[in-house]
Curated annotation (Swiss-Prot):
Highest taxon, organism lineage: Bacteria
Organism: Escherichia coli (strain K12)
GO biological processes: DNA damage response; galactose catabolic process via UDP-galactose, Leloir pathway; glucose metabolic process
InterPro entries recorded: Aldose_1/G6P_1-epimerase, Gal_mutarotase_sf_dom, GH-type_carb-bd
Coiled-coil portions: none
Name listed for the protein in its UniProt record: Uncharacterized protein YphB
Sequence intervals crossing the membrane: none
One term of GO molecular function: aldose 1-epimerase activity
Length: 290
């Protein structure tokens, strides 16, 4: 495992080639993402990529253009093919400078055969990450992208992200029924604290922008996705699930498609890529000092 360090002014970024994950993002000594453990395990990191799609496909199967495809579980602790392969694979460095890095990963087994590049770039106040995935298989398939960033959480943390509804969670951490009425504790259309309880829900009607305020540290993070991501997930763990969890981090995950879009007509917001075709998504995290 190799750790690549980028810096620009007071910003510093650590990225690992194992999983293509971010292992830390700081302004001087202030963590802007949860510091990673540099363990080689993506769920211990600060952020990991979601490719060739995000979240899960119920039943580990989908029908596309008249053909049925069967996915296989890819981690021991989940019954589903979870978050794709990029977060579990070994990436290769193709370029590295003081403030920029580009990694690539190729996957040639299972249903999806593809090549993905992930470019990181720092400016004085912004981290920009760009994912570009190319279908290297023999068939047209539905693709999506996203990221799984972990943010510091305190009682003072506030988040704001537009939504017109959300999916309930059902068994095996799958997205369930869609509800247009947001409960007060999950309504982030205006800045609001996160509930001190388990949350694992997707939100629809997003404009691709979010604001995460950390007043105790004197800063806010402004997330922006290009093209605007239509969905985000909020994850807050629980000590009953993770014995070491102390309500000290949460995830706000931008996704280019809704959960389980493989089962929606024409793949929902998933993008059909013919062999050789590509799709690109970008996430920026801008630091604003309060």
């Amino acid at each position: 495992m190799t750790i690549y360090t980028l810096s620009h002014g007071s910003l510093k970024l650590d990225v690992s080639d194992q999983g293509g994950v971010i292992e830390g993002f700081w302004r001087d000594t202030t963590p802007l993402l949860r510091p990673g453990k540099k363990s080689g395990v993506a769920t211990d990191a600060s952020c990991f990529p979601l490719v060739p799609f995000a979240n899960r496909v119920s039943g580990n199967r989908f029908v596309w253009q008249g053909r049925e495809y069967q996915l296989q579980p890819n981690v021991e602790w989940d019954a589903h093919y979870l978050h794709g392969d990029g977060w579990l694979g070994e990436w290769q460095c193709v370029s590295h400078s003081d403030d920029s890095l580009c990694l690539v990963y190729e996957h040639r087994s299972g249903v999806y055969h593809y090549r993905v590049s992930q470019a990181f770039h720092l400016t004085a106040d912004t981290l920009t990450v760009t994912l570009s995935v190319t279908n290297q298989g023999a068939e047209t398939l539905p693709f999506g992208t996203g990221w799984h960033p972990y943010f510091p959480l305190s009682p003072q943390t506030r988040i704001q992200a537009q939504a017109s509804g959300y999916w309930l969670e059902r068994e095996q951490w799958l997205a369930g029924e869609f509800c247009e009425q947001l409960p007060q504790e999950l309504d982030f259309n205006q800045p609001a604290p996160l509930p001190r309880q388990w949350v694992n829900n997707g939100f629809a009607g997003w404009n691709g922008q979010a604001r995460i305020e950390q007043p105790q540290e004197g800063y806010a993070i402004i997330m922006e996705t290009t093209p605007p991501a239509p969905c985000y997930f909020i994850f807050v763990s629980d000590p009953a699930f993770d014995k070491g969890y102390a309500f000290d981090f949460f995830c706000l995950e931008p996704m280019s498609h809704a959960p389980d879009d493989h089962h929606r007509p024409e793949g929902g917001d998933l993008i059909a890529l013919a062999p050789g075709e590509s799709t690109t998504s970008e996430m920026s995290l801008r630091v604003e000092w309060l």
